[in-house]
């Protein structure tokens, strides 16, 4: 018995009739008639044998007992009217029964045929008849699919849910799984994990692998790990790659099952060989870190590559890292950038950060700070802490953007609050120096401490400084030493240097020059210029090490070449006096000048001396005064004294006794004995100041009590002659002897004069010479007398 499909389409009138896919010619007059009149024959100009006869005329099967299956596409009321007429006019009782029994299967069959032929609209209509009129759950599922995907009908997730539910309530596992997905993903209904789990579990108990996997996920979300493992296992046994992957994670971490990393790797492999990208990436992790398998970077690279080619962003990023570092593959920065870009374009923050690094450092791509900032910003806006830190640094240093300390603080704070130690350290600097925020030593110390406790050596050093100097912390040198030691152990050269200073001074630790030397040496060997300079001092003076002036020169040279002004000055002294190196006044001047140009007041003073005496340069008192002034204006007491003498005697500068006194005063305020003596001379002789012998004695005494031989000599003269003090030969002799003991030649002459007699005129001459500071003449006179 053959089955013949009759398809009738109706809108406002009869549109078409197809018999086994062949369209019937319908007179226009028939199309507009009521449904019942389609079945009646028409005579006259319009030839129409009635629908039943016309169908049979198109039936080429020649079977008397052919069964006709009718599909009416149109309004429901017209359909019911049509089907009633079919039973009345077209078919016998036996055929009608066959249609009722077999039509629902025919609709499904026809729908599948239309689907295969690519006629989505006709497929939907056929499924709809089977679903609506016959309640077939598989058809209801297909109708829901059509609504969900907009296939053959306007997309409607709400309608999809209606039909999934009809099928699900008839225990259709696929529909139950799909309905669970709707509740889980809020497709056509409000999100409801409880309902999702109910329908997933209903499908899962029927053996639906996808539902078993999703049931496992929902239980895992509730931390019901044992239940999750149960359902993952069932799905994994059906080779569901997603379930194998999730079950692998459970075995790796021991969630809901005993930890078994080898089992985890095995499950990742099963999912990976099925092409599941997440599992391929995870298997790459296993080989990269030796998780459950022997570490094999080449295998790791291969699995990352497989996942990366499928678009897995994390695998693409890891592939970039492997190409960057030459791990598991030949180093190729260009390839690295390519993979970072793919992952970054997908929005992976870590890859965006890595791509920023490539642009900032010119790795595999032309250096471009602006592009670096662009990618750092994208990652930072996703709250990727490392990128927030680097973006903060860019604003702090002006890399790719204008320096903006407030913006720097904003990003550094975000990273610091996520625990990035480097960000905490730099944020501490911002609070310490007042960059982008108000200066706050307490906050600076607090951020240093957070970073220091994470092992950040720079913060440990800074925290040590806080404790040493009472910055945001109570002063505690022992605590300072503790943090310096931690930083020094991490190789921080600044901390090693400061620790050396603590051992040198005995701050927070017992004084120990050998330990100080070792700390300075470690720091110096790392290139710390200050430590190199200090190490030179230790070698020069034999502090904690055998004295070695050649080594002193070596370390001064290293520091000097780094621009350390103190070392440059010291190196100049070494060359001037031939200490540890052959005497070379030309090189002495060279290093003095470098140091002086760097603002070192001692070098400026020394350069002034060289110009005053013509050592290594043409004697030039004007230039001498110029360099003395530079040093004096920086507060160097001896240079202030020297500049005072230049004004006092008009050496290289216009004679001005008042300015001389002004500079002597600046110098004596710092306790300079030579200036005290010369200020005494000014008071004694009334140069630049009103004559006052008592004041003169006061300043001579200050100078003398510091052990300055010329001050002692002048004070002795006052006692001998009763100038500003009562005449006192014994005190005069006492101070002359002190001056003589320190090699002041005029003092020897004065002592012998007092102990003999008749040389008063010579004494008066010597005292006069002392008053104007002509020491060399007094010394010469002393030697003559002694001879």
Which residues are covered by each model-predicted region?
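Hydrophobic face of amphipathic alpha-helices that form TPR/SEL1-like repeat modules
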Residues: 109-113, 130, 142-149, 178-185, ...
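Short helix-capping/linker turns of helical repeat alpha-solenoids
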Residues: 114, 133-136, 149-151, 169-172, ...
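TPR/TPR-like (Sel1-like) alpha-helical repeat modules
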Residues: 268, 628, 730-745, 752, ...
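Acidic, low-complexity, intrinsically disordered interaction modules
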Residues: 35-71
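Canonical positions in the second alpha-helix
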Residues: 129-130, 166-167, 202-203, 234-235, ...
